[in-house]
Amino acid sequence: MGTLLTFEPPAPHLRAALLARCGIDVGEAAATRAIRAEIAYYRAHLHTGGDAAGLAALRRASAEAMRPELGIDADADVLTAALLDALRFHAFPEVPGALRELRAAGLRLVVVSNWDVSLHERLAETGLAPLLDGAVASAEAGVAKPAAEIFERGLALAGVRASDAVHVGDSEVEDVAGARAAGLRAVLLSRDGRGDISSLDQLRSYSSLW
C-alpha cells in the first residue's frame, strides 16, 4: 500500500462515524486500539477476501475485532459501516504524475499487491485505475508476495518476461526479495528515506533499467 496509496488516520473518522451512526462517543485511545486490532485481524485474514461474499465476511469479522477495544454494544452492521467510513484511501501526491510519465515512456504498469478483491475498487476510487494496465490482488490470486506465483500473474497480465520487468515496492522481503527470486529486477521505495527511492517520481533516475 505504501508504494501508491495511503490512508488518512482512521481513528478520528471511526469516532465520528460511531457518533453519527449510533450516538456513541468512544474515546480517542479506544478508537486507536480498535483500529490496531482491526488491522492485525485483517492482515492475518485478508486471503479470505477473494470474492464479494468473502470480502463481506472479512469486513464484518474485521469490524468485530474492534468490539473488545471499543467496549460498545453496537449492531454488527453499524460497526462494519463505521469501519468502512473510517478507511479513506488516497494516492500519494506524486503518484498520478509519475504513472503518466512511465506510461508515456511506453511501459506497461501492473499493480501486484497483498490485498483483498477491493483493490480494484480502491484503485478506481483514487483515480489510478485508468493509469494502469491491470492489478493482481493476492486474495484473488490465491497466493501472496513474496511467492513467485503472484509476480508471474503480474507478468502475464503485463505481457512481459521477468527479465524485462522491474518491480517497485516498499517491503524488502515481500517486494524486493520476492521479485528478485522470481527473476525481476527490484527497486525499494521507502518514504522514510531508507530505500533506493523515497517517492515514485524518483524512479526516473532508474530509467536505465528499462
Tell where the protein language model's regions lie, with residue ranges.
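Asp-based, Mg2+/Mn2+-dependent phosphohydrolase catalytic module
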Residues: T6, A20, A29, G71-V78, ...
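N-terminal helical cap/lid subdomain that shapes the substrate entry/recognition surface
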Residues: M1-P96, A105
